[in-house]
């Protein structure tokens, strides 16, 4: 093969082409690739941050859910405790009312018993006077002998 002027001219033009490409074309291409690489790195970092934030959000939501469950359990326990207190208060009030009713009934029964005893005493006194009158065959004056009849009632 002969090395002639065409080959030398082509080599010179090729060297000039490489120099122009390295001087004017290559730096913007390198800058574009570096920018793209930085964008990709930022995207990956953002994805990593997003994943981390998602994990934190999941943890916060689990904590909030647990806390809500604890609060609801506390509310239920407080409600049950309050309901038990209300039941106990109602039982106490009912017992007091029942005791009052029983005491009132006992007092009323005692009054009725005393009234019946009083009526019975009066009736016994009348029967005693009637019996004594029949025995003596004379009339005993109830107003004249009121002291004696009162003493008889007391004895009975």
From Swiss-Prot:
Residue ranges of the TM segments: 7-26
Major localisation: membrane
InterPro entries listed in its UniProt record: ATP_synth_B-like_membr_sf, ATP_synth_b/b'su_bac/chlpt, ATP_synth_F0_bsu_bac, ATP_synthase_B_chain
Gene3D superfamilies: F1F0 ATP synthase subunit B, membrane domain
Record keywords, A-Z: ATP synthesis, Cell inner membrane, Cell membrane, CF(0), Hydrogen ion transport, Ion transport, Membrane, Transmembrane, Transmembrane helix, Transport
Alphabetized GO MF terms: proton-transporting ATP synthase activity, rotational mechanism; proton-transporting ATPase activity, rotational mechanism
Domain of life: Bacteria
Signal sequence, renumbered to the chain: none
A GO CC term attached to the entry: proton-transporting ATP synthase complex
Compartmental location: Cell inner membrane
Membrane topology, record value: Single-pass membrane protein
Pfam families: ATP-synt_B
Entry similarity comment: Belongs to the ATPase B chain family.
Function: F(1)F(0) ATP synthase produces ATP from ADP in the presence of a proton or sodium gradient. F-type ATPases consist of two structural domains, F(1) containing the extramembraneous catalytic core and F(0) containing the membrane proton channel, linked together by a central stalk and a peripheral stalk. During catalysis, ATP synthesis in the catalytic domain of F(1) is coupled via a rotary mechanism of the central stalk subunits to proton translocation.
HAMAP family, per database record: ATP_synth_b_bprime
Subunit structure: F-type ATPases have 2 components, F(1) - the catalytic core - and F(0) - the membrane proton channel. F(1) has five subunits: alpha(3), beta(3), gamma(1), delta(1), epsilon(1). F(0) has three main subunits: a(1), b(2) and c(10-14). The alpha and beta chains form an alternating ring which encloses part of the gamma chain. F(1) is attached to F(0) by a central stalk formed by the gamma and epsilon chains, while a peripheral stalk is formed by the delta and b chains.
Name used for this protein in its record: ATP synthase subunit b
Species name: Dechloromonas aromatica (strain RCB)
């Amino acid at each position: 093969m002969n090395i002639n002027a065409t080959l030398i001219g082509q080599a010179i033009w090729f060297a000039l082409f490489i120099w122009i490409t390295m001087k004017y074309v290559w730096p913007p291409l390198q800058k574009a690739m570096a920018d793209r690489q930085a964008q990709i790195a930022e995207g990956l970092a953002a994805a990593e941050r997003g994943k981390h934030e998602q994990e934190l959000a999941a943890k916060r939501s689990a904590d909030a859910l647990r806390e809500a469950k604890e609060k609801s359990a506390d509310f239920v326990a407080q409600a049950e405790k309050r309901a038990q207190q209300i039941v106990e208060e109602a039982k106490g009030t009912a017992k007091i009312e029942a005791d009052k009713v029983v005491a009132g009934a006992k007092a009323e029964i005692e009054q009725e018993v005393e009234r019946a005893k009083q009526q019975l005493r009066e009736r016994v006194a009348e029967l005693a006077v009637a019996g004594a009158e029949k025995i003596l065959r004379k009339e005993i004056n109830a107003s004249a002998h009121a002291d004696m009849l009162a003493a008889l009632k007391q004895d009975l």
